[in-house]
Structure formats: structure tokens, C-alpha cells
């Protein structure tokens, strides 16, 4: 790592365990024609292991200007590595390839949830994603109804992905050690999307709205007719519904709004 010091404002905790790095790369199942995108290259520990598997190309997205010289020197001999010197949220992944991508990274804790939600909007070009994130966030990704871990993020991402909790990772495997345990998760897009890309943003806002004041009954947030048409108890709360319930409820919500427009036209 040379003289590099991880920066708190970027939420940087560099992964230094070779065993965990290898496990992440194994989960990516890299083939020679793969396009891999890494979010947050840091000093390149994970990047190097990815490049050893010889994918077609690796795009490393990094916002921290102070590590650019380190990355460029470390990977100067790799023709299949491209450093993208930008914030992930300013990068259009669709412009990187005409095919599918594999997405990975040891995500900064301060923006991990935002990145995870954003990942869903690339599901049409995503082959799979493997991330290191805070354990608390990982538990929410695989959260079940009627538990404290079941949140907006659980429902939204489980709608589009099959999510595996791969392993927990202790703080000592990072530099500097974070104050929390981390976890590796793998997200594989579902073969058939229950909500179209065109409606994804509306669905995100819909689920988020239902989880606001999560203890309130659904009848206080959504028309009773929609609930009845979806077969949902008006007295139920968002945390009690399955992912399939949310999908069905959203479908009825769209139909109801469409019918309402027709009636008013």
C-alpha cells in the first residue's frame, strides 16, 4: 500500500485478507470473455486477483485521486485493465460494453446502500454482482418478513435478485479495521423480471412509501380497493408482506391508476 492512507470521507477500509479476496473472485466465476467492473479499486488488492483470472477486460472505478499513481503503476503492464477516474454514480455502465457485466467491489460503508439500490437499474446488463458490505446491510438484503432486518432494501432488491449471504468477514481483515463486521454477498438477477425496467423507479418509490412509518397499517397509505384487489389485508403492515405481495400490490396500483386515467379522460 506504500504511503497510502485510507480516507474516512470516502469510507475506505482496504481489504487485506488474501483468503477473502480469493473467495470474492471465486464467487465471480470469471471467464476469459467476461467484462468485470470493480467499484472502488483502492490500492488494487482485489483488482490484482481478478486480473489473474484473465477476463476480457476489467474496469476499475475510483474516486480518490491520491491512489491513481499507485493503481497506474501497479497495473501498467495489464492491457485488459482500464482505470475510470470518476465517482461510480457519474459512470454509465451501459457505455462500457455491448454485452453483460460482472460487478464487484469492497463498497465504502457510507454509500454502500445507495450503490446496491442503484445496481438494480443495471439489471438488464448485469450477469451477477459480488460485494463486500457491512454485515448489518447484508442481513437486510436477505431479510425475511416480520423481522427487524426486513426493510425497503430487502423487498426492492429481492424483487430482482436471488441474493446469497456468502460469508461474514471480521474487522481485522481490513486496514484500518472498521468498527463493525462485514460480509460478502452475491446477487444473481432473476431470469424473469417481475417488474419491468420502465416501472422500476416507480416500484422503488412505491415500496419506499409503504415502508415509511413501517408500523402504520397499509390502509392509511394506499387505497382500500387496491388492497382488496391484491388480496391484501388493509390492517396489515408493510413488514408483514412477502416480496410477492409487494409485486402484486404494485401491479394492482398501476392498473388502478391507469383505469382512473381512463375514467377521467
From Swiss-Prot:
Write out the catalysed reaction. adenosine(1518)/adenosine(1519) in 16S rRNA + 4 S-adenosyl-L-methionine = N(6)-dimethyladenosine(1518)/N(6)-dimethyladenosine(1519) in 16S rRNA + 4 S-adenosyl-L-homocysteine + 4 H(+)
GO molecular function: any one? 16S rRNA (adenine(1518)-N(6)/adenine(1519)-N(6))-dimethyltransferase activity
Q: Name one Pfam family in it.
A: RrnaAD
Q: Which UniProt keywords apply?
A: Cytoplasm, Methyltransferase, RNA-binding, rRNA processing, S-adenosyl-L-methionine, Transferase
Q: What is its EC number?
A: 2.1.1.182
Matching entries from InterPro entries are given as:
KsgA/Erm (IPR001737), rRNA_Ade_diMease-like_C (IPR023165), rRNA_Ade_Mease_Trfase_CS (IPR020596), rRNA_Ade_methylase_Trfase_N (IPR020598), rRNA_adenine_dimethylase (IPR011530), SAM-dependent_MTases_sf (IPR029063)
* Record's signal peptide: none
User: PROSITE patterns in the record, alphabetically?
Assistant: RRNA_A_DIMETH (PS01131), SAM_RNA_A_N6_MT (PS51689)
**Annotated GO CC locations:** cytosol
Q: Which residues bind S-adenosyl-L-methionine?
A: 13, 15, 40, 62, 87, 106
Please verify whether the record's keywords include Ribonucleoprotein: no
UniProt subcellular location: Cytoplasm
State the family it belongs to. Belongs to the class I-like SAM-binding methyltransferase superfamily. rRNA adenine N(6)-methyltransferase family. RsmA subfamily.
What is the stated purpose of this protein? Specifically dimethylates two adjacent adenosines (A1518 and A1519) in the loop of a conserved hairpin near the 3'-end of 16S rRNA in the 30S particle. May play a critical role in biogenesis of 30S subunits.
Q: What is this protein called?
A: Ribosomal RNA small subunit methyltransferase A
| Organism of provenance | Persephonella marina (strain DSM 14350 / EX-H1)
Q: What is the lineage of its organism?
A: Bacteria, Pseudomonadati, Aquificota, Aquificia, Aquificales
Amino acid at each position: 500500500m506504500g504511503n497510502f492512507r485510507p480516507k474516512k470521507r470516502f469510507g475506505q477500509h482496504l481489504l487485506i485478507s488474501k483468503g477473502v479476496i480469493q473467495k470474492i473472485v471465486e464467487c465471480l466465476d470469471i471467464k476469459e470473455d467476461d467484462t468485470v467492473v470493480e467499484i472502488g479499486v483502492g490500492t488494487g488488492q482485489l483488482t490484482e486477483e481478478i486480473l489473474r483470472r484473465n477476463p476480457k477486460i476489467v474496469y476499475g472505478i475510483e474516486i480518490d485521486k491520491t491512489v491513481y499513481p499507485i493503481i497506474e503503476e501497479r497495473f501498467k503492464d495489464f492491457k485488459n485493465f482500464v482505470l475510470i477516474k470518476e465517482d461510480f454514480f457519474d459512470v454509465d455502465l451501459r457505455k462500457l460494453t455491448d454485452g453483460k457485466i460482472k460487478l464487484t467491489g469492497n463498497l465504502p460503508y457510507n454509500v454502500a446502500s445507495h450503490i446496491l439500490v442503484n445496481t438494480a437499474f443495471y439489471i438488464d446488463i448485469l450477469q451477477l454482482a459480488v460485494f463486500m458490505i457491512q454485515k448489518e446491510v447484508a442481513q437486510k438484503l436477505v431479510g425475511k418478513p416480520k423481522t427487524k432486518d426486513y426493510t425497503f432494501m430487502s423487498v426492492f432488491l429481492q424483487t430482482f435478485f436471488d441474493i446469497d449471504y456468502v460469508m461474514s468477514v471480521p474487522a481485522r481483515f481490513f486496514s484500518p479495521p472498521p468498527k463493525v463486521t462485514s460480509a460478502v454477498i452475491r446477487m444473481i438477477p432473476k431470469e424473469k423480471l417481475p417488474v419491468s425496467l420502465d416501472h422500476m423507479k416507480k416500484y422503488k418509490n412505491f415500496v419506499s412509501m409503504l415502508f415509511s412509518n413501517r408500523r402504520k397499517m397499509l390502509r392509511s397509505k394506499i387505497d382500500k380497493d387496491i388492497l382488496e384487489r391484491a388480496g391484501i389485508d388493509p390492517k396489515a403492515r408493510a413488514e408483514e408482506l412477502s416480496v410477492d405481495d409487494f409485486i402484486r400490490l404494485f401491479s394492482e396500483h398501476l392498473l388502478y391508476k391507469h383505469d382512473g386515467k381512463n375514467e377521467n379522460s
